[in-house]
Amino acid sequence: MNIFRFAGDMSHLISVLILLLKIYATKSCAGISLKTQELYALVFLTRYLDLFTDYVSLYNSIMKIVFIASSLAIVWCMRRHPLVRRSYDKDLDTFRHQYVVLACFVLGLILNEKFTVQEVFWAFSIYLEAVAILPQLVLLQRSGNVDNLTGQYVVFLGAYRGLYIINWIYRYFTEDHFTRWIACVSGLVQTALYADFFYYYYISWKTNTKLKLPA
């Protein structure tokens, strides 16, 4: 494992910890898209089908468990916690994510590296992760104002994907037969979706003003 992948994993982990901190410390999920969190839970559940069959390393197994458990915990809190669920912005979180799931599953069936159950679901999870942030970005755009923790959560998610792109470039030039083209293309799409948010986040940071997204 190279430094770029490790840094990407840590950025991803930090984003999850920030979101958990926001939910548990404030007992609020205002500004957070439940639909995005459900998509991420589905991403991890389908990507890590090999958790109990293919052992790579202790680090790898721990990270898989952490991301599965944390994504399910976040969804549970937003749906079931008596205090947290009251703050859910249901009226703003209206992105029709079921169509995204269907489209990504069809893509997984058609475009995969090997037509097996595990590889089809792996491809599906990669495609789905690329667009899972869409409901969150739409919700933030509709609400206008973005609180500090939510903004940092999205920034670290974007940093995670950006670092993974550097990781793939590094592996392409240093490893023989590196052909994860599905992950590379999907990663570029995912990073592009963050571009607008990063621009306004930078402007907010530079001017020391509250982050606001145009409607």
From Swiss-Prot:
Keywords: Endoplasmic reticulum, ER-Golgi transport, Membrane, Protein transport, Receptor, Transmembrane, Transmembrane helix, Transport. The chain crosses the membrane at residues 3-21, 36-53, 62-82, 99-112, 120-139, 152-170, 182-202. It is found in: Endoplasmic reticulum membrane. GO terms for cellular component: cis-Golgi network; endoplasmic reticulum; endoplasmic reticulum membrane; Golgi apparatus. GO terms for biological process: protein retention in ER lumen; protein transport; vesicle-mediated transport. Required for the retention of luminal endoplasmic reticulum proteins. Determines the specificity of the luminal ER protein retention system. Also required for normal vesicular traffic through the Golgi. This receptor recognizes H-D-E-L. This is ER lumen protein-retaining receptor A. The lineage of its organism: Eukaryota, Viridiplantae, Streptophyta, Embryophyta, Tracheophyta. The gene is ERD2A.
